[in-house]
Amino acid sequence: NERINASLLWFSDGYVEYKIPNTLEHNQHPEMLEMSLEIASEFPISNNTWPSDITFSINGIPVGTFTSPGNYSDVRGKLTPKWWDENYSQYGLLKHLRITNTNTGIDGEKLSDVNLTDLQLKSSPFITIRIGIAKDAKNKGGLTIFGKDFGNHPQNILLSLFYSEN
């Protein structure tokens, strides 16, 4: 599938899903799952004020929804290639989603009570990440995901699993 190599992905409806091998050993216990990515809404050409409710799910469990304020083209993205039209989406917001043993948050703000136990990481060979626009979303403003070659942050989607051992 070509999407794993994409540096810019956008859609107005639906979701994208990634399956990542779960390498937890039997003596390791998840303490925190963190995802970092640069995202924005999606609008034909661009619109800095275009809210979109972006829902994150892990292993089939919706963990929370972030409302992106817009799809930005007011200034050129630091990494956005010169060949990309300056009127199109240029950059997003760098977001940090964290799931702990107590709840889920984004950038230090609580999103939901979903916790690591709910995700059943110990019993799954994969960690399945879904990012998208829910069918019942209030703000259906699409989604843009920026990889390491677009936007302002030189990174792809990063997923880190912190664990303890016994």
Language-model segments: residues:
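Proprotein-processing/basic-patch segments
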Residues: 132-166
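Mid-protein regulatory/catalytic core that forms ligand/cofactor-binding pockets
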Residues: 1-86
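Histidine (H) residue identity feature
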Residues: 26-29, 96, 153
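Hydrophobic beta-strand residues in large extracellular and virion-surface proteins
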Residues: 37, 56, 127-131, 159
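Extended, solvent-exposed segments with strong compositional bias
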Residues: 2-9, 69-122, 139-141
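Hydrophobic transmembrane signal anchors and adjacent membrane-proximal interface regions, especially
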Residues: 37, 99, 143-145
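Noncatalytic modules at the cell exterior or secretory-pathway interfaces
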Residues: 30-33, 85-86, 116-136
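Generic hydrophobic, helix-prone segments enriched in Leu/Val/Ile
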Residues: 30-31, 94, 157-160
